[in-house]
C-alpha cells in the first residue's frame, strides 16, 4: 500500500496488524477514563455492581473512547505527522488508510452504543455518545486549532466516563454524579497544560494555540494553580452533601494537598524566571493522573465500606 500524498513514508511493514488498530484507540489514554467509569459504578451501587454489567460497560466504554481516538487521529493526521510525539501513529504514517480507520472507528462506536443500550441503560448509551461527540466534534474539529480554551472546553469529553458508569448502574444521574463530572472538568487543564508546557515548541510549529504558545509560561502556570484550587475545592464538596464520609474526605485532603504542592513548585520555578524543565513539569503531569485515580478509588471505597 502506497502512503497517500502528503503523508510521510515509513520503514514499517505496509500491512497493518491488530496492534496497529489497537494503537488507533489510544489505549494508554483510555485506561484512566475507564478507571473513572468503573469506580463510579461502585460508587453508584454502593457495593458490587455485578460482574456482567462491569464487563459490558468496560468493553463498551473502551470501544466508545477508542472510537473517539480513531477519529481524532484521522482528523489530526496532518499535524500528527509533524510532531515527534505522534509522527508514527498509524494514520499519520499512512499504515492505515483514512477509509479503513473510519470504518473501524464507526464500527466501534455503533457496537458500543448498542451494547450499552441493550445490556446497561439507554442513558448510559447517550452519555457515552455525548462524550464521543464532544471529543471529536467540539474539541478536535472546532476548538483544538482555533483557541487556547481548547483544553478547558474540549476537556469536557473526558468528564463523561463516570456519568456512563453511574447511569449504567442507576439509570439516572444525581448531583454527586455531576460533581464527579465537574472534578474531572477542572482537573483536565492542570494535567494537560503541564504536558503542553513541555512540548509547546511542537505545538507552535504545527499551529496549535495551546495556552503556553499563545500567552506564555507564566500565565500557564498561574492558570494551572487556579484550576488545581478549583479541583481540590470541588473534590471535598460532596462530603458536605452527605454523599461520602470521612475516609473520602481525608483522602481528598491529602491528595489535594499534594496536587497543590506540585502545582506550586512549577509556579514558583517559572515565576522566578526559569525556563520550564522536565524535572519540575513531569512530577505534576504524572501525579495528576495518580491523583484522579486515587480520588475515585477513595470515593468508591468510602461508599462501599461506609455506606
From Swiss-Prot:
CDD domains: PT_UbiA_Cox10
One example of a Gene Ontology biological process annotation: heme O biosynthetic process
Keyword NAD: no
Biological role: Converts heme B (protoheme IX) to heme O by substitution of the vinyl group on carbon 2 of heme B porphyrin ring with a hydroxyethyl farnesyl side group.
PROSITE patterns xrefs: UBIA
Note: Carbon 2 of the heme B porphyrin ring is defined according to the Fischer nomenclature.
Any Gene Ontology CC annotation: plasma membrane
Keywords attached to this entry: Cell membrane, Heme biosynthesis, Membrane, Transferase, Transmembrane, Transmembrane helix
Protein name: Protoheme IX farnesyltransferase
NCBIfam families reported for this sequence: cyoE_ctaB (TIGR01473), PRK04375.1-2 (NF003349)
Topology within the bilayer: Multi-pass membrane protein
Catalytic function, reaction form: heme b + (2E,6E)-farnesyl diphosphate + H2O = Fe(II)-heme o + diphosphate
Molecular function per GO: protoheme IX farnesyltransferase activity
Similarity-based family: Belongs to the UbiA prenyltransferase family. Protoheme IX farnesyltransferase subfamily.
Gene: ctaB
Protein species of origin: Deinococcus geothermalis (strain DSM 11300 / CIP 105573 / AG-3a)
PANTHER family: 4-HYDROXYBENZOATE SOLANESYLTRANSFERASE (PTHR43448:SF7), PROTOHEME IX FARNESYLTRANSFERASE, MITOCHONDRIAL (PTHR43448)
Pathway involvement of the protein, from the record: Porphyrin-containing compound metabolism; heme O biosynthesis; heme O from protoheme: step 1/1
UniProt superkingdom: Bacteria
